[in-house]
Amino acid sequence: MSDQPPPYTPLPLLSSFPPNPYPDQTPDPASTPTLVLPNPAFPNKRKRTGFRRKLPSGSPAAPVAVAASPSAQPPPRASAADDIIVINREPTAEAVTALTAGFPADSLTDEEIEAGVVSDVGGIEQVNYILIRNHLLTRWRETFNSWLAKESFATLIPPHCDHLLNAAYSFLVSHGHINFGVAPAIKERIPKEPTRHNTVIVVGAGLAGLAAARQLVAFGFKVVVLEGRKRCGGRVYTKKMEGGGRSAAGDLGGSVLTGTFGNPLGIVAKQLGLPMHKIRDKCPLYRPDGSPVDPEVDKKVEGTFNKLLDKSSLLRASMGDVAMDVSLGAALETLRQTDGDLSTDQEMNLFNWHLANLEYANAGLLSKLSLAFWDQDDPYDMVGDHCFLPGGNGRLVQSLAENVPIVYERTVHTIRYGGDGVQVVVNGGQVYEGDMALCTVPLGVLKNGGVKFVPELPQRKLDSIKRLGFGLLNKVAMLFPHVFWSTDLDTFGHLTEDPSHRGEFFLFYSYATVAGGPLLMALVAGEAAHNFETTPPTDAVSSVLKILRGIYEPQGIEVPDPLQSVCTRWGTDSFSLGSYSHVAVGASGDDYDILAESVGDGRLFFAGEATTRRYPATMHGAFISGLREAANITLHANARAAKSKVEKGPSTNTQACAALLMDLFRQPDLEFGSFSVIFGGQASDPKSPAILKVELGGPRKKGATEGGKADQHHSNKLLFQQLQSHFNQQQQLYVYTLLSRQQAMELREVRGGDEMRLHYLCEKLGVKLVGRKGLGPGADAVIASIKAERNSSRTKTRPSKLKIGIPKSKS
């Protein structure tokens, strides 16, 4: 089944608008305003000078004209035009704004439908809701430095649509589409103290983690962010370089805002008052000997490259599902041999340069990219200029991290999650407990098993982690005494003769206009990026200087030695293990969705660029995913609170439940050491519920120690020290937990005494021991069912049954 996006069409919503909302004004078809925006179906990855996937373009190809048609008719309903509200005179322009913000201009998103924003999907109510939603989005984009108050729209919205205004406003705020960012008016709304009892642990202080944490703090949650590095930002890292009285700020990771129209990071930059430098289209290429590439040859080869990409699209369409098992590289090589028309060495070198650029755009080898889905996100490219941020993207990171509680140098190695909350274990054994956790670690770390999940993640999520690709891009940043390269361009490229080295310093970024100093960045992509990981920095810098001197010294321009150089090693960075994600052979866009799914009944959530199907491998994708998960966490917290409120009704008698539990444990179904278990459900079902009681303190029971080996394991884990200390106290303490029949049977088989069983229970099974009150309403239902089953069994005559495990002592 093909995963290709449907053909792009003009906004069908316009057919729902009344023919003329202003009957006293007759529109002139010739003067009807037409909005032109780039066709989202055009594959931008093939262009020359972009960051990751989104590349700057001079004039958009295949423009889509969006205009309000004077002959458009309302839905087939009597007096429909009278029912459709009129907010302003430019509904079409506002529909385009919604489109650039990631909304369908004429329909609801799945999230809006799930939120129940309208009672009649597809009716007039939906049309009015969309008009209100689009208007709110447009107003927010115009007034991003102010808090957008719902009350300011009261006079615009008819009273019978107040519920739609409430629904649209609530949805847009809670999902981070409006009233987000770092403007003073937004920050003033953040509560000084938490207003909720829920604690959320955010793992990772990259853009996803910071976006989520900032939203959650604004929503009133208790939040703590755990970051393994000494800095925030993750794969967005602005390095200050200094030497010889010069200084400059260079982005060693994410560096380009890819499309500013609709990009939420563009809004954050505007809130900070930061000017954005549009990356200019000019990108001259130089041959291996340093001479300029013939413009006519350049044009011919670029046309051939684009033609082969078009043919690869036709090829995958004809192959159907088989295309999922074929790489883009294999398809392009086959097509090159049959339709390439590349006859000279210069043409082949140019073609290989374009292949290197494609590998750069996807952070993956072409031999690994899926022919079927490598460009599945192209329809969602952000519209607008591609820009550098003066001073680096670290300025965005620092503003987002302001007043967010971040604990640095805390490397997370275990995340336990269950029905009663989460535990996050960091280096040194320190444990952070919370109600929910958000994991934002890069896909490379997940692939490498850098974080252990207890219980293990669902198999479908593990499979998606394995299928998706995580590639590599490296850079060499060089601060020079002065600018010796052309100042009328932001990029230039260099060709290589060896195809296996085609990505080696193939593209240069000039940061002289935005870094505060003469800074030049050389990019290393594809196979060369992997080889670069083990290249000595001095050798790398020497190779770059050789290229630069080959280009400029024949022009009579001296190339000085750099004052400072930095080589990245993202592939061996333990906190990233790569650069960004791509759709590998065998994977699809569905895998991004699966990675985004929460687990543990709304206890553990996931964010990051590899969890967004629409915007993978981008900075704004990471940021948007953080806003998304802040909304999901809030929804689950609200649902859990509502459920708890219902279940904790006046009929609940805590003392009666406690007494009943004590009575049931007088005849446990299973007993070993200081552990006893009562079972609910059917004995044949290994997943049936059970309640475990652990007796801490008091006299030891038979089986409490085995083989005399328990002492050597005592206190190995900081997590268990407090529990284990109770064994040496005089008073008795009972703690409980819910688990399955199968888990209880596994626990019985653990050797090494009660200490090892405690270790297995908490470390392997990931459960949390609590007092009677901590069991919660779920356990009350199990207790009641066990009592009912036992009462029923007493009415029947049957032989006495032996208990499994160590029998109780006879009196």
UniProtKB/Swiss-Prot annotation:
Broad class of enzyme this protein falls into: oxidoreductase
Compositionally biased residues, Basic residues: 44-55
GO biological process terms held by the UniProt record: chromatin organization; spermine catabolic process; thermospermine catabolic process
GO molecular function, one term: spermine oxidase activity
Signal in keyword set: no
Domain SWIRM per the UniProt entry, residue ranges: 88-189
Cofactor(s) this protein cannot do without: FAD
Pro residues: bias regions: 1-10
Skewed-composition ranges (Low complexity): 56-71
SUPFAM superfamilies: FAD-linked reductases, C-terminal domain, FAD/NAD(P)-binding domain, Homeodomain-like
PROSITE patterns from the UniProt entry: SWIRM
Positions of the UniProt region annotated as Disordered: 1-79, 790-811
Swiss-Prot/TrEMBL keywords: Chromatin regulator, FAD, Flavoprotein, Oxidoreductase
Enzyme Commission code(s) on record: 1.-.-.-
List of residues binding FAD: E227, R229, R235, E609
Origin: domain of life: Eukaryota
Family classification: Belongs to the flavin monoamine oxidase family.
Biological role stated in the UniProt entry: Probable histone demethylase.
Name by which UniProt lists this protein: Lysine-specific histone demethylase 1 homolog 3
